[in-house]
A protein has these predicted regions:
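Conserved mixed alpha/beta catalytic, RNA-binding, or beta-rich assembly cores of soluble enzyme
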Residues: 2-8, 24-28, 41, 46-153
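Active-site gating loops and adjacent loop-to-helix segments of metal-dependent hydrolytic enzymes
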Residues: 8-18
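Short, basic, glycine/proline-bearing loop/turn elements
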Residues: 18-20, 132-138, 162-165
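C-terminal binding/interaction regions
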Residues: 149-171
Length: 171
């Protein structure tokens, strides 16, 4: 984004070049620099899970349906995809069905990814899962992946069988 230097106070002005360079590094790089700036100013940055751990889902099956063997295999494949994409800072989610990677989250986010599945639902294998987890090395204190009711509705509309999340890594 462009930054209008006339809107920046004198205390912040020296940080503009650093913030601009960080933004060019992608989400992970930018967030790490922002945390460094706050910590250098004397703030302690903590994740909401440290302050309100009850907001993180518990370990285990959170729905009425337990995953079958194929769901488990799909989740394992999806986890490997997220780990593989992590160094590229691409996304935090993917959809897998029958061991086939149907879609990966990119710049457009999870909603866009799921909309792309909904638009071509008949072209994909049936079933499958949405997998969501932090990227390897992701700064979890201020960038924790989230899933809400709208995501759940889209997963159903896309014809996926369920959602698998990384314990302690998704809200």
């Amino acid at each position: 984004p462009s930054i209008d230097p006339t809107l920046i106070d004198s205390a912040t002005r020296p940080l503009v070049a650093r913030i601009t360079a960080a933004l060019a590094q992608g989400d992970d790089g930018a967030l790490k620099i922002i945390i460094e700036i706050f910590e250098h100013a004397g703030f302690q940055v903590v994740g909401f899970g440290q302050v309100m751990p009850e907001l993180l889902p518990p370990l285990g099956i959170l729905s009425h349906r337990a995953p079958n063997r194929q769901d488990q295999d799909d989740a394992a494949r999806a986890a490997a995809v997220i780990v593989g994409m992590s160094p590229l800072d691409i996304g935090q989610a993917c959809a897998v069905a029958g061991s086939h990677v149907l879609a990966v989250e990119a710049y457009g986010g999870t909603e866009w990814m799921l909309q792309s599945l909904i638009a071509r639902r008949q072209a994909w294998p049936t079933g499958g899962i949405l997998f969501k987890a932090p990227k390897t090395g992701q700064e979890r204190r201020i960038d924790l992946p989230a899933i809400g009711p709208a995501t759940c509705r889209q997963v159903k509309k896309a014809g996926l069988d369920g959602i698998v999340i990384a314990h302690g890594g998704v809200v």
